Amino acid sequence: MAEDQRKVWLIAEFLEDSFVGCSVFYDYEDRERVARSYRIVDYNTGKLLHHVFVSRAFLDDHAEAEIVPALQDLALVGCLRIAGTRRVTVKSQMIEIEVGA
């Protein structure tokens, strides 16, 4: 579990570094399907900019040292910018953007 916590922190740090001027909040979601939920909020306005779900499979399939490179390879930051406030789910080898909203 300690390794999982480190992975969760690495993802939060990656998002904070990628979205300067924003706060990143994370918490548990459905343990069966989604491991963590991250909300990226504009620090000045409090407006929700992005909502990311990171699957249990992603955390399980990537070693700690692979987390950030895998997010970069999946182009997570670009996907978030395209998605806006729509939900983005990071799966083991792909990213899904919620349709609509």
Region spans (language model):
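Negatively charged, low-complexity tracts enriched in Asp/Glu with abundant Ser/Thr
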Residues: 1-28, 60-77, 81-85, 96-101
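C-terminal interaction segments
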Residues: 89-95
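Acidic, low-complexity, intrinsically disordered interaction modules
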Residues: 43-69
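Amphipathic, interaction-prone secondary-structure segments
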Residues: 13-53
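Unusually extended, aromatic-enriched hydrophobic runs near protein termini
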Residues: 31, 88-89
